[in-house]
Amino acid sequence: MELREKILERIKVTSSGCWEWQGATNNKGYGQVWCSNTGKVVYCHRVMSNAPKGSTVLHSCDNPLCCNPEHLSIGTPKENSTDMVNKGRSHKGYKLSDEDVMAIMESSESNVSLARTYGVSQQTICDIRKGRRHGRLRR
């Protein structure tokens, strides 16, 4: 059986038109399937988009389970990152406002407490306080 057929047998079409993979996923939620030809696990969305090796596949629907070729496009890592930022899916640390950063720099609270308050890592708080992030802002 061809790999694409194997994938199509295990999808569920949603009301938004996504073809959601119903099998195994990785820790980021992307569908995975065993390819007997190569002896490797491959990403379903890459197979369905006919992505060349080394390329980046973008999901217009932002659904990592989606295998619908109409929701997939080939792009660059930079385009994928820009898409993530524009859609608010980037690392939470990038969502801090300038006011948040200034409050972090001026706070006497612990890194642990501030990380919980702002929903970022302790390392992000540490980096802000040491000027390694948001260096354009000064106390």
Swiss-Prot record:
InterPro entries: His-Me_finger_sf (IPR044925), HNH_nuc (IPR003615), Homing_endonuclease_His-Me (IPR044930). Pfam families: HNH_3 (PF13392). It comes from the Viruses. GO terms for molecular function: endonuclease activity. Disulfide bonds: none annotated. SUPFAM superfamilies: His-Me finger endonucleases. This is Protein 2.8. The lineage of its organism: Viruses, Duplodnaviria, Heunggongvirae, Uroviricota, Caudoviricetes.
